[in-house]
């Protein structure tokens, strides 16, 4: 019974890198919760680049008992490019156990569009592991179009937040991406 009560929806920040705030998760919560953000979906890409699975474990642990609901998309490209040596490498097998965590919603920002389009084994293993568990795959492929976009979408990438032109956004929407 909600008689005499007020229900107010909370804002869900659908894509952040929580560690980029440069504060611990509890401090981040203190900053955003009073302003209406009640949930976030974070990609711990930056901390994973440096600390690997220990960084992901830290973020999961530090957010477990917050009032702020913190959900995760697993970092898909660590390191971000094959030319980088940032401290860690995450392969499909390194991510598999995380999919059992109910706060892990899927695979974040598949930045390796060329590897996806060329069906590189390591990239496809990450996509398949996520898809086989019924989780979402988010994209990160600015400028991708035509046959390459078709291949990217066929690999299961459901979204792309990198569109900067209306025509690019429309093409991706027509292919079923959001």
Question: What do these predicted ranges mean?
Answer:
Residues 3, 58-66, 157-163:
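Short, structured secondary-structure boundary patches
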Residues 17, 45-46, 142-143:
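Catalytic metal-binding/acid-base residues of hydrolase active sites
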Residues 23-24, 91, 139, 145:
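Helix N-terminus capping/helix-initiation residues
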Residues 26-134:
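Divalent-metal coordination cores built from histidine and acidic residues
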Residues 109-178:
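Active-site core of metal-dependent hydrolases
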């Amino acid at each position: 019974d909600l008689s005499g009560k007020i229900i107010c929806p909370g804002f869900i920040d659908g894509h952040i890198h929580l560690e980029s705030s440069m504060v611990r998760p509890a401090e981040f919560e203190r900053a955003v919760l009073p302003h209406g953000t009640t949930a976030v979906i974070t990609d711990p890409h930056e901390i994973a680049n440096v600390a690997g699975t220990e960084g992901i474990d830290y973020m999961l642990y530090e957010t477990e008992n917050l009032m702020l609901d913190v959900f995760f998309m697993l970092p898909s490209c660590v390191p971000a490019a094959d030319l980088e040596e940032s401290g860690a490498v995450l392969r499909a097998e390194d991510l598999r156990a995380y999919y059992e965590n109910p706060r892990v919603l899927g695979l974040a920002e598949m930045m390796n569009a060329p590897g996806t389009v060329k069906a590189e084994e390591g990239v496809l293993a990450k996509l398949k592991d996520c898809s086989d568990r019924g989780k979402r795959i988010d994209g990160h492929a600015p400028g991708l179009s035509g046959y390459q976009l078709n291949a990217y979408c066929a690999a299961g990438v459901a979204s792309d937040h990198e569109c900067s032109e209306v025509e690019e956004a429309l093409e991706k929407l027509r292919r079923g991406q959001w």
